[in-house]
């Protein structure tokens, strides 16, 4: 009989969001007439930008002609999209990232997991706590951690707590760590990091020859001009950081699928014989072997994000969701809740009242008023006592959900 990858057996019983879906389904089956408002998973709700729809429609028409048909595209992404990304997302901000350093993919979730393919298993790893579960689970699946402990953490991982006491900014590790996961604007807390604080992480990585895996999936929601959109705005970051970006949240591509990862050609790692190895060729080879590229039609849609009309329409989407976040934060604060985030990110991070646990508060909101959020403990041990609400929903649902919560 075939042997299984036993690392999967170390995973906690259920991934956070399927567990939420399971509880919601059970409640719905017992309460057929329940009107449930879901502010849990970070999935967008508004239609795609018109510019993207038109671009994809045109591309689809091209595919229906002999001259315009496209088969397999370059695994790294079409050059015209990579050049637009380089120009608008990086060069415009003073970041010298070339189009060749940009790899188009079908999602940051995939890339942040797949990047481990080119990194050795003996690297020490640090994650914030709470944290996007994929960072931890992908390391568990690939044998980079020890067994799980009773408190839900894993042996072999360094956990960096983020909470009210440190303004949701992690402290630098006390010892040398090889791989550092950072996400700003942060999921789940909605916290941000300024250039001075981010520079401390870059300096740490340079000093310790560490690699920062920087998730900037929510950078488009930044409202404060003093908050960096990319880690490459920090001097030296091209020598120590990989950045993940996505069109999912800013352009509503969660169901379309397009993202990109930046692998600077400066980045190096070590072989077992202490030979310096460039990371860019390794990732290029990995993608060429395991990935067939994003479809031509989708990449044309992503390209339209950078058109004049596309930029206006994307800004409209971002403004809409951020107004939702503002409404949620103001109403909850006025009702006496301690609320964080929501200013430069589409997530609201609530301190759970009455010393309830995160999951107890989840069940309380679901059963009392039919509102679904995400228990903070699902993001890690330090998330216990907190609760995440997402601004990704219709205005009417957001207003309705807030009225239900504050009138319990």
From Swiss-Prot:
GO annotation (BP), single: lysine biosynthetic process via diaminopimelate, diaminopimelate-aminotransferase pathway
Gene Ontology MF: a single term: pyridoxal phosphate binding
Main enzyme class: transferase
EC numbers for this chain: 2.6.1.83
Modified residue annotations for N6-(pyridoxal phosphate)lysine: 249
Keyword Protein transport in annotation: no
Top-level division of the source organism's lineage: Bacteria
Residues that bind pyridoxal 5'-phosphate: 72, 108-109, 132, 187, 218, 246-248, 257, 292
Sorted UniProt keywords: Aminotransferase, Pyridoxal phosphate, Transferase
Cofactor(s) required, per the database record: pyridoxal 5'-phosphate
The reaction(s) this protein catalyses: (2S,6S)-2,6-diaminopimelate + 2-oxoglutarate = (S)-2,3,4,5-tetrahydrodipicolinate + L-glutamate + H2O + H(+)
InterPro entries the UniProt entry points to: Aminotransferase_I/II_large (IPR004839), DapL/ALD1 (IPR019942), PyrdxlP-dep_Trfase (IPR015424), PyrdxlP-dep_Trfase_major (IPR015421), PyrdxlP-dep_Trfase_small (IPR015422)
Keyword field contains Transferase: yes
Gene3D superfamilies: Aspartate Aminotransferase, domain 1, Type I PLP-dependent aspartate aminotransferase-like (Major domain)
Pfam families linked to this entry: Aminotran_1_2 (PF00155)
Residues reported in the UniProt entry to bind substrate: 15, 42, 109, 132, 187, 292, 388
Pathway: Amino-acid biosynthesis; L-lysine biosynthesis via DAP pathway; LL-2,6-diaminopimelate from (S)-tetrahydrodipicolinate (aminotransferase route): step 1/1
Subunit and interaction comment: Homodimer.
Entry function: Involved in the synthesis of meso-diaminopimelate (m-DAP or DL-DAP), required for both lysine and peptidoglycan biosynthesis. Catalyzes the direct conversion of tetrahydrodipicolinate to LL-diaminopimelate.
HAMAP family cross-referenced by the UniProt entry: DapL_aminotrans_1 (MF_01642)
Similarity comment: family membership: Belongs to the class-I pyridoxal-phosphate-dependent aminotransferase family. LL-diaminopimelate aminotransferase subfamily.
Protein name per UniProt: LL-diaminopimelate aminotransferase
Natural source organism: Prochlorococcus marinus (strain MIT 9301)
Taxonomic classification: Bacteria, Bacillati, Cyanobacteriota, Cyanophyceae, Synechococcales
């Amino acid at each position: 009989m075939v042997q299984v990858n036993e690392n999967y057996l170390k995973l906690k019983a259920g991934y956070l969001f399927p567990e939420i879906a399971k509880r919601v389904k059970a409640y719905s089956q017992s309460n057929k007439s329940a009107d449930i408002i879901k502010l849990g998973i970070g999935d967008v709700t508004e239609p795609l930008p018109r510019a993207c729809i038109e671009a994809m429609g045109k591309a689809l028409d091209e595919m229906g002609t002999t001259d315009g048909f496209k088969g397999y595209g370059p695994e790294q992404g079409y050059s015209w999209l990579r050049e637009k990304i380089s120009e608008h997302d990086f060069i415009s901000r003073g970041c010298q990232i070339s189009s060749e350093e940009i790899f188009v993919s079908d999602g940051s979730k995939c890339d942040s997991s797949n990047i481990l393919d080119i990194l050795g298993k003996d690297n020490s790893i640090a994650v914030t706590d709470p944290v996007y579960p994929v960072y931890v689970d992908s390391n568990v699946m690939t044998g980079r951690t020890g067994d799980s402990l009773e408190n839900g953490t894993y042996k072999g991982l360094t956990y960096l707590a983020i909470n009210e006491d440190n303004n949701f900014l992690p402290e630098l590790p006390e010892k040398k760590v090889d791989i550092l996961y950072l996400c700003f604007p942060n999921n789940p807390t909605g916290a941000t990091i300024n250039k001075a604080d981010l520079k401390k992480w870059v300096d740490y990585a340079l000093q310790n020859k560490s690699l920062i895996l920087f998730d900037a999936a929510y950078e488009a929601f930044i409202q404060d001009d003093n908050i960096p959109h990319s880690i490459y705005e920090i001097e030296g970051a091209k020598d120590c950081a990989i950045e993940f970006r996505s069109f999912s949240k800013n352009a509503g591509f969660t169901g379309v699928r397009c993202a990109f990862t930046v692998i600077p050609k400066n980045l190096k790692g070590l072989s077992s014989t202490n030979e310096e190895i460039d990371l860019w060729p390794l990732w290029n080879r990995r993608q060429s072997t395991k990935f067939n590229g994003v479809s031509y039609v989708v990449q044309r849609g992503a390209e339209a994000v950078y058109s004049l009309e596309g930029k206006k329409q994307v800004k409209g989407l971002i403004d809409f969701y951020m107004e939702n976040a503002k409404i949620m934060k103001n109403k909850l604060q006025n009702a006496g809740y301690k609320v964080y985030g929501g200013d430069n990110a589409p997530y609201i991070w609530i301190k759970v009242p009455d010393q309830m646990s995160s999951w107890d508060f989840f069940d309380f909101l679901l059963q009392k008023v039919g509102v679904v959020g995400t228990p903070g403990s699902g993001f890690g041990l330090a998330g216990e006592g907190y609760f995440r609400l997402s601004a990704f929903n219709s205005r009417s649902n957001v207003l309705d959900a807030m009225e239900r919560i504050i009138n319990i």
